[in-house]
Curated annotation (Swiss-Prot):
UniProt-recorded name of the protein: NAD-dependent protein deacylase
Function according to Swiss-Prot or TrEMBL: NAD-dependent lysine deacetylase that specifically removes acetyl groups on target proteins. Also acts as a protein-lysine deacylase by mediating protein desuccinylation and de-2-hydroxyisobutyrylation. Modulates the activities of several proteins which are inactive in their acylated form. Catalyzes deacetylation and de-2-hydroxyisobutyrylation of Eno at 'Lys-326' and 'Lys-343', respectively, thereby promoting the enolase activity.
Family statement drawn from the similarity comment of this UniProt entry: Belongs to the sirtuin family. Class III subfamily.
Residue positions of the active site: 150 (proton acceptor)
The gene coding this protein: npdA
Organism, scientific name: Proteus mirabilis (strain HI4320)
Catalyzed chemical reaction(s): N(6)-acetyl-L-lysyl-[protein] + NAD(+) + H2O = 2''-O-acetyl-ADP-D-ribose + nicotinamide + L-lysyl-[protein]; N(6)-succinyl-L-lysyl-[protein] + NAD(+) + H2O = 2''-O-succinyl-ADP-D-ribose + nicotinamide + L-lysyl-[protein]; N(6)-(2-hydroxyisobutanoyl)-L-lysyl-[protein] + NAD(+) + H2O = 2''-O-(2-hydroxyisobutanoyl)-ADP-D-ribose + nicotinamide + L-lysyl-[protein]
All copies of domain Deacetylase sirtuin-type, residue ranges: 10-285
Cofactor(s) this protein cannot do without: Zn(2+)
Entry's Gene Ontology cellular component terms: cytoplasm
InterPro entries linked: DHS-like_NAD/FAD-binding_dom, NAD-dep_sirtuin_deacylases, Sirtuin, Sirtuin_cat_small_dom_sf, Sirtuin_class_III, Ssirtuin_cat_dom
Length: 285
């Protein structure tokens, strides 16, 4: 008799646990289904940013009308050959930029914050921010899904192993890596002219799936980034240029808005929110 009662008790407990598990699974299924349906209605957006978005934050573009960077030839401070000729000069050049970036006055502007809000709304599966900038203002504004195709100023790299390290101080020719059997001198984690940009496979994959491509603060004279708009159009994406003035590839864009980045980007993102929330709206309008 006792064995029978114990058996019934175990059976009730088993059924209760099974019922709770079924209920949990059902709730989880409907939650995921709802989330998927919501995400399916969101556009896939790729954003490209250039120096123009950070100019209002006090970041110098460095390139003057005569082609010099802070009175240095580009060939001397932004090429592998220049680094091999005079590594001390190159380190000094980027040390100055690194110090400037970390000044308290250098902060994100409304354009950076607007893009962070857009990413938060769309979710990482529907949003990729590709930047040509080597500053960290997108991160400071709250953006997460960022691809720095030209590297990052606050990082250094071992040229032998390819490992990347955080670095906020000055870098000298006597700073070596600790990741190799025979340590190599660390170099700025910057993509110089003549080197392959970072993450190109991921970028082209995102462009092939994009519904909307937005270029912000770009000049249109540096490839391969200048060709992204063409790639996006080939797969049917709507293309938008938000710039202080027309870029060299402005004819490739279907929609254009010109003015300070802090104004035109914020205004366009708010417009985009309205379009997304209107089921009858057309993103191309």
């Amino acid at each position: 008799m006792m064995k029978l009662k114990l058996r019934h008790r175990r059976l009730r407990k088993f059924r209760k646990i099974k019922s709770l598990r079924r209920q949990h699974s059902r709730c989880r299924y409907f939650h995921l289904t709802h989330k998927t349906e919501h995400e399916m209605n969101l556009p896939k957006v790729v954003v490209l940013t250039g120096a123009g978005i950070s100019a209002e934050s006090g970041i110098k573009t460095f390139r003057s009308e005569d082609g010099l960077w802070e009175e240095h030839r580009v060939e001397d401070v932004a090429t592998p050959e220049g680094y091999h000729r005079n590594p001390k000069l190159v380190q000094q050049f980027y040390n100055e930029r690194r110090r400037q970036l970390q000044q308290p006055s250098i902060q994100p502007n409304e354009a950076h914050y607007a893009l962070a809000k857009l990413e938060q709304y769309l979710g990482k599966d529907n949003f990729l921010l590709v930047t040509q900038n080597i500053d960290n203002l997108h991160e400071k504004a709250g953006s997460k899904h960022i691809l720095h195709m030209h590297g990052e100023l606050l990082k250094v790299r071992c040229p032998q192993s390819g490992q990347v390290f955080e670095w906020k101080g000055d870098l000298s020719t006597t700073d070596y890596c600790h990741c190799c059997q025979f340590p190599s001198p660390l170099r700025p984690h910057i993509v110089w002219f003549g080197e392959m940009p970072i993450g190109m496979d991921e970028i082209y994959h995102a462009l092939a799936q994009a519904d909307l491509f937005i270029a912000i603060g770009t000049s249109g004279n540096v490839y391969p980034a200048a060709g992204f708009v063409h790639e996006a159009r080939l797969t049917g994406a709507h293309t938008v240029e938000l710039n202080l003035e027309p870029s060299l590839v402005e004819s490739e864009f279907e929609e254009k808005h010109y003015g300070p980045a802090s104004q035109v980007v914020d205004a366009y993102v708010h417009k985009l929110f309205d379009l997304i929330n209107d089921p009858k709206a057309d993103l191309t309008q």
